[in-house]
Amino acid sequence: IAALHEGGVEMETILPSLRTIPQIEGRMERIEEGQPFNIIVDFAHTPDGLEQIFKFASSITPKEKRIIAVFGSAGKRDTKKRPIFGQLADKYCDLIILTEDDPRDEDPLQIAEEIASGIAKTNRILIESRYDAIRQAIEVANVGDTILILGKGDENFIYREFGREPWMSDPAAVRDILRRYYFEPEEEEDHETAE
């Protein structure tokens, strides 16, 4: 926008064109499947990225409703940021569900504990399986709440000790869970690596 405007294009010309720009999957992606609460998937995986999405969620969530965050931290990356992630979530969220996010050869629950060390007051749950963590968030959400699924965006893999493992992607997991368990509850199945 700034480059176009600096190049002489009037804002009145630029702004209407923004409506035709397609959504970038996994970046501030709202999942709308008819559920009575907000679900936003975002790639945020840095302190600044998390704070920005938390602030946005605060701006769209009524004061009496909850912000529920599902996220983790990548293994073998920026370990000193983990407590900071917890502090930021503690400041903005009402429920924090910590889960795996590219653990590589680290224990996902140990990573979650390091994030949790920055959480002072907010209720938190540790669920290793990313699919199950997303499902838990959807199951506990109430009308008007906002769920944030953070860290992986639309990536369709999870880095583990042995390399890349297929992952359905966060947007696909949300839609699958809504369809299977929220709108049409079915028996338990394992959907960890479904595509």
What are these regions (language model features)?
Residues 2-195:
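ATP-dependent carboxylate-amine ligase
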